[in-house]
C-alpha cells in the first residue's frame, strides 16, 4: 500500500488517480497543523466575543438570521449532519468514497474551515483503515456544496449510519471500532465545514476524467489498428499538416499516431504503391477529432486539479485578519462545465470509433470481406456487433447534453441557482462504459481485419495490442456467440493496458 504525504493544496492528478484506483495510507504533513489550529482559535475568539457569524452561531440557509445560543452550538452541529443526510439511491463504491474523503481532508486541512485537527485526523484514520461510510449516489445539486452526500460521510464520525469494511456493511459504532475510533462530538462550525464543499462533485468528475483518459489511449491504439486493417495511409499524420494549423491537441494527437504506427510495417509496405488517393474521414481526420477531444480532456483536467485542491467551504475563516466571510465557493459550476466538456470528448471518441467499425463492414471501403467474415451469407460476422456500437453511440449523444445549463431553485429560493455538477460527473460513468464497449467492438474488428490480411504484421508498438486480444479471443472463422467476446475485450480495456503504449505526458494524470 502506497503512503501519500498530504500537503494541503498540493495534490496532483496522478496522486488522485492512484487514490481512486488503490487503497492508500495517508499522512498529513505537519505544516498543516498551525493553520488548522489558527482557524479554530479564530472561531473560538468569535464565540468568546459573542459576535454573530453565519455557520458558527446561526442557523443555515434561509434560517441564517436565527441566532443560536452558546449552549446549543454542539447540538446545532450534530443536527445539521443528521438532517442533511437525506440522500437516496445505491451506495457509492469504495473507490469513489475514498476519493471523496481524501478531497475533503485536503480541503479542510488548508486551514480556512475552523475545524479541529482531531476531526481531520479521524477522517484520515478511516481512509487508512479502509472503513468507508455509506454515501448514496443521489441527493446533491452541486450547490450549496454536496450537502446530502457529505452529511452521509459525516454521520460515521458521529457514530450514526453505517460503513463498509472489507466488503461488509457494519453499524457505525462497529465500523469506528475497526479503525480504533470513538464517536466524535462536533464543535462550533465543524458540522457545516464537513458538509459544505464540492468534493463529491469533484470526485464524480475525476472518475470521468480518468476513464476518459484511459479510453482516449485505447481509441488511439485501436484507431491505428484500423488504419492498418483498412490499408489506410500514414500521410495524414505527417507533422507538417498539423503544424500549419497550430492546434496543440491536434499536433500531439498526430504525433501519437506517428508513434504508434511507426514509419513502416509489413502492412504499410504491402500497399505503398496503391492508387488510392484519400482515406475516409474516420481514418484521415483522427488527429483533428481526437486532438479536439484531447484539448477538452486537458482543459477539464486543469479545472479539476484546481478544484481538488480548493477550499469550497462556506463561510471561510481568515484567521490572520480574524474574519469569517460568507461567499459561494461551494457552487460547483466549474466542475459541472468541466464534466460537460468531458462528456463531449467521450461522445466524440465513441462516435469516431463507430465510424471506423462501420467502414470495416463495407467491402468497398475496407477491401475486406463483408462484415469481416468468410463465407458471408451463411455467416453474418460483425453485422450486429456494428449495430450495437451504433446504438451505444446514439445513446451517448443524449447523455452528452450539458448538465450545467440546468438549474432548479432550492432551500425556499435562498439557493436559487445550482450547478448540477454531481449529475454532470455521474453520467460520465455511463458514457465511459458505452465507449468502452464501442472500442471493444472496434478492437475485435480491427484484429479480425488484420488477420484477413494474410497475417501481415502491423507496427512493433501496435503488435502487442493485437496479440493481447488474440490471447483471449480467437479469430472468427465462422459465426459464434458474440457477446462474451465483447465483454472480454471490454474488460481488457478496463485494465488500462493501452496506457502503456502512449507517449509520456500526453494525458494529464498519467
UniProtKB/Swiss-Prot annotation:
Provide a Gene Ontology MF annotation, just one: histidine ammonia-lyase activity
Top-level taxon of the source organism: Bacteria
Xref: InterPro entries: Aromatic_Lyase, Fumarase/histidase_N, HutH, L-Aspartase-like, Phe/His_NH3-lyase_AS
GO biological process terms, semicolon-separated: L-histidine catabolic process to glutamate and formamide; L-histidine catabolic process to glutamate and formate
Question: At which residues is 2,3-didehydroalanine (Ser) found?
Answer: 144
- Keyword Lyase appears in the UniProt entry: yes
Task: Name the EC number(s).
Answer: 4.3.1.3
This protein's pathway: Amino-acid degradation; L-histidine degradation into L-glutamate; N-formimidoyl-L-glutamate from L-histidine: step 1/3
Which reactions does this protein catalyse?
A: L-histidine = trans-urocanate + NH4(+)
Q: Which Pfam families match?
A: Lyase_aromatic
PTM characteristics: Contains an active site 4-methylidene-imidazol-5-one (MIO), which is formed autocatalytically by cyclization and dehydration of residues Ala-Ser-Gly.
Arranged from A to Z, the UniProt key words for this protein are:
Cytoplasm, Histidine metabolism, Lyase
Xref: NCBIfam families: hutH, PRK09367.1
> Belongs to which family?
Belongs to the PAL/histidase family.
UniProt xrefs under PANTHER family: HISTIDINE AMMONIA-LYASE
**Name of this chain's protein:** Histidine ammonia-lyase
Amino acid at each position: 500500500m502506497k503512503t501519500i504525504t498530504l500537503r494541503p493544496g498540493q495534490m496532483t492528478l496522478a496522486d488522485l488517480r492512484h487514490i481512486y484506483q488503490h487503497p492508500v495510507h495517508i499522512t498529513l504533513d505537519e505544516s498543516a497543523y498551525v493553520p488548522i489550529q489558527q482557524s479554530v482559535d479564530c472561531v473560538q475568539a468569535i464565540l468568546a466575543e459573542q459576535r454573530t457569524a453565519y455557520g458558527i452561531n446561526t442557523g443555515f440557509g434561509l434560517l441564517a438570521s436565527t441566532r443560536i445560543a452558546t449552549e446549543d452550538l454542539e447540538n446545532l452541529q450534530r443536527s445539521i449532519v443528521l438532517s442533511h443526510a437525506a440522500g437516496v439511491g445505491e451506495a457509492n463504491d469504495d473507490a469513489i468514497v475514498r476519493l471523496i474523503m481524501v478531497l475533503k481532508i485536503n480541503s479542510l486541512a488548508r486551514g480556512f474551515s475552523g475545524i479541529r485537527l482531531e476531526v481531520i485526523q479521524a477522517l484520515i484514520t478511516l481512509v487508512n483503515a479502509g472503513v468507508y461510510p455509506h454515501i448514496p449516489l443521489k441527493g446533491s445539486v452541486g450547490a450549496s456544496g454536496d450537502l446530502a452526500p457529505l452529511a452521509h460521510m459525516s454521520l460515521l464520525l458521529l457514530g450514526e449510519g453505517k460503513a463498509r469494511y472489507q466488503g461488509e456493511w457494519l453499524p457505525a459504532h462497529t465500523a469506528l471500532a475497526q479503525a480504533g475510533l470513538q464517536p466524535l462530538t462536533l464543535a462550533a462550525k465543524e458540522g457545516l465545514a464537513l458538509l459544505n464543499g464540492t468534493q463529491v462533485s469533484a470526485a464524480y468528475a475525476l472518475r470521468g476524467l480518468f476513464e476518459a483518459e484511459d479510453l482516449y489511449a485505447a481509441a488511439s491504439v485501436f484507431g491505428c489498428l484500423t488504419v492498418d486493417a483498412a490499408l489506410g495511409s500514414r500521410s495524414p499524420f505527417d507533422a507538417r499538416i498539423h503544424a500549419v494549423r497550430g492546434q496543440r491537441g491536434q499536433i500531439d494527437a498526430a504525433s501519437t499516431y506517428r508513434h504508434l504506427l511507426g514509419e513502416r510495417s509489413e502492412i504499410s509496405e504491402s500497399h505503398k504503391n496503391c492508387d488510392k488517393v484519400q482515406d475516409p474521414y474516420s481514418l484521415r481526420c483522427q488527429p483533428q477529432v481526437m486532438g479536439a477531444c484531447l484539448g477538452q480532456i486537458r482543459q477539464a483536467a486543469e479545472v479539476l486539479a484546481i478544484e481538488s485542491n480548493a477550499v469550497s467551504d462556506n463561510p471561510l475563516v481568515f484567521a490572520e485578519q480574524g474574519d469569517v466571510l460568507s461567499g459561494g465557493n461551494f457552487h460547483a459550476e466549474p466542475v459541472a462545465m468541466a464534466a460537460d466538456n468531458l462528456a463531449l470528448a467521450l461522445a466524440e471518441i465513441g462516435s469516431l470509433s463507430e465510424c471506423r467499425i462501420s467502414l470495416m463492414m463495407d467491402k468497398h471501403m475496407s477491401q475486406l470481406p463483408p462484415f469481416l467474415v468468410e463465407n458471408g451469407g451463411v455467416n453474418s460476422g460483425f453485422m450486429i456487433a456494428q449495430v450495437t456500437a451504433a446504438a451505444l453511440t446514439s445513446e451517448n449523444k443524449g447523455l452528452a447534453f450539458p448538465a450545467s445549463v440546468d438549474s432548479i431553485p432550492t432551500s425556499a429560493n435562498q439557493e436559487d441557482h445550482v450547478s448540477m455538477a454531481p449529475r454532470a460527473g455521474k453520467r460520465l460513468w455511463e458514457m465511459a462504459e458505452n465507449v468502452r464497449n464501442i472500442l471493444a467492438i472496434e478492437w475485435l474488428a480491427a484484429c479480425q481485419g488484420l488477420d484477413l490480411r494474410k497475417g501481415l504484421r502491423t507496427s512493433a508498438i501496435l503488435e502487442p495490442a493485437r496479440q493481447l486480444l488474440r490471447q483471449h479471443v480467437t479469430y472468427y472463422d465462422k459465426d459464434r456467440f458474440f457477446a462474451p467476446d465483447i465483454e472480454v475485450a471490454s474488460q481488457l480495456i478496463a485494465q488500462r493496458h493501452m496506457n502503456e503504449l502512449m507517449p509520456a505526458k500526453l494525458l494529464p494524470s498519467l
